[in-house]
Amino acid sequence: MAVSKEISEFVDEVWPSVKKDIAALVAVDSVEDLAAAAPGAPWGPGPRAAMDEALDQARRHGLETCDIDGRIAYADLPGTGDGVLATIAHVDVVPAGPGWDSNPFELRERDGYPVGRGLVDDNGPSVLTP
């Protein structure tokens, strides 16, 4: 089987799960709210909720997680090894500006493409690059 066909079949197989995980992150209004900051949630409850969702997803996919006082978190493949490969992403968003004609915190499809707050920066990439 050609590699491109294998990749296409794999994407078709996992896309519903990937889309569900992205939708769960998009659904979190993770705009910084320093007035509501608290221990473990220094950026406010929205970013804390988004971090919790991302960590839950990582654990569900078999990764080990670490939360450093709500400021930063990471997920790691279990086991040991000399090599390190890191991907960096964030799951908070800036406030939704004007121009949204639908709920920005609901993943929708428009003209065959997914649309939602934080989809490209950085919720989608955070799901796709654990």
List each language-model region with its residue ranges.
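Acidic/His- and Gly-rich active-site-bordering loop/insert found
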Residues: 2-119, 123
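Short amphipathic alpha-helical face segments that pack within enzyme cores
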Residues: 124-128
